[in-house]
Amino acid sequence: TLALHDALPIFILEVGKKIPILGVCLGHQGIFTAFGGEIIRTDPVHGKQCHIYHQNKGMFQGVSNPLLAARYHSLICKKDTTPSSMDIIAETDNGIIMAIKHQDYPIYGLQFHSESIGTHDGKIIMKNFLEMKVS
């Protein structure tokens, strides 16, 4: 039998071929590690807002830029271990990864909490994601 850490990338890729996947916070980190990236500790940012910069397309189409977003975490994706199959699609002004997308499949991760009242335009992000189709 496969251990969970071995099965997770297989599960994410198989499901992500059929339906869009969105990992938020720990789910974002799970997607990042599933494809080979590393997670590191950082200073806790629980209930804090920061500006996030994005490319104003895909999930971020029509979203303010920078986006004021709520963060609740003490772990982050280690940027120099970004898997070759993933694109960084949003980050903080000091380069912390805030969103990723798989290059071939509709598999996304958000480090911040789009569902939080502390995230401006969070409803737009969720609407954009829910309207995505598998190509």
Regions found by a protein language model. Name each.
Residues 7-62, 68, 126:
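Cysteine-nucleophile active-site neighborhood
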Residues 116-135:
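Acyltransferase
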Residues 69, 108-112:
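Active-site-proximal beta-strand elements of phosphoester/diester hydrolases
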Residues 75-76, 115-117:
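Short histidine/acidic/glycine/proline-rich micro-motifs that form metal-
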Residues 56-104:
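Catalytic beta-strand/loop cores that center a nucleophilic Ser/Cys/Thr
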Residues 49-51, 97-99, 109:
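Conserved hydrophobic/aromatic beta-strand scaffold that supports enzyme active sites
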Residues 1-6:
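Positively charged, low-complexity/disordered segments
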